[in-house]
Amino acid sequence: MNRKAEETAARHGMFPAGCQVVAGVSGGGDSMAMLHLLLHPTFSLPVTVCHVNHMLRGKESDRDEAFVAKLCKAWGVPCKILRCDVAALARKKKIGVEECARLVRYDFFEQTAAKLAEASGAPVRIAVAHTLSDRVETMLFHLARGTSAKGLCSIPAARGEIVRPLIDCSRREVEGYCARHNIPHVTDSTNRSVAYTRNRIRLRVVPELRLVNAGAEENARRLMEDIREDDEYLSALAEEALLRARRGQAYGAGELDALPVPVKKRAAAMILDRWNAEKSAAQIDRFCKIIGEKSGTLNLSGGRRAQVKRGICSLWEPPEPYFEIPLTDGEHPLPGGGRVVVQTFDKKSYPAFQKIHKNEFHYRMDCDLSLIHI
């Protein structure tokens, strides 16, 4: 496993010279193996551990926090701990608990990394302990739910500052590493529950695949890499095509429609993404359809529309809503800034006032103040 992790890190340039590492450590076997490996002579990197107590499993969550803190003290590793009532935060934000927990974790990791980088001036990487098994399970989850080629690529080895040195190592290899090196770890009791979709895949689907072929995970890894390489190439072609088809803030529909279907769909997804619109497979197909028909509209969120007219594909947005200002004397603020000053005169006094202040008056109106608004 040491060799695999070292080759993975080198292939993806995970740890540049002089870098520091923020390691996300839950206390489970995967993250403990990663921490041990980062401190091992293979890497021998300066590491700061980050642990998040999500407060979701009562005493078990507190046990994990205490375990990580105690072990880091014994190993002489700096440790940062965050306690967060994720369930309450998820209700407040109106998002799922799992998604909320992920956002809290990565925000904590990134804040810690930013502080370390500012203090040291050295590059900082955030290491998380996803394994090949996690990657395969995620691919199967995406496949069952419905996804694109990008979704089948599953979890990337590296993205920005986030790196995954164990991404080519199976969970069995990690368990063997922990056993050989007597690495202590804790077990999350919820991992054994098939009430969670990912656990059903892990506990039921993947073992069946191994019965078909013991090398199923490695075969899946090769397939995911092939898909990733193809997707990156086709996405690059789509980016180039969009540059050629660009017409100011719009695009030439004919040029987009002439693209090969895999490139056209990726270009459509990129346009929808730039317009902050839904980019589901069905929406991408609808977008490609109006491009092919040379005219038509596609409803987007917020009352907006993608429209093709006279060979140009553009985004139509509803005009700013009208606003009213009551014609009462005084100063009235305008939406977006500015002001209007209203002053009324009777017919007799206005001509005399205009002579004195003629440079200040450009428009006037005769109106019934009880009916007219501007």
Question: Model-predicted segments: where are they?
Answer:
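Electropositive, surface-exposed helix/loop patches at the edges of structured domains
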Residues: L116-A129, N219-S235
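Generic structural signal for hydrophobic core residues of well-folded globular domains
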Residues: L143-A144, L166, L209, I227, ...
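Mid-to-C-terminal catalytic subdomains of enzymes
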Residues: H181-E218, R222-E225, I356-L371
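AMP-forming adenylation/ATP pyrophosphatase catalytic core
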Residues: N2-G29, T48-H54, C84-V86, V104, ...
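Core alpha/beta nucleotide-donor-binding catalytic domains of modification enzymes
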Residues: M1-P207
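Short, well-ordered coil loops that connect the C-terminus of an alpha-helix to the N-terminus
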Residues: S44, V77, G215, R274-A277
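Alpha-helix boundary/capping and short turn/kink residues
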Residues: R145, A149, R171, R210-A214, ...
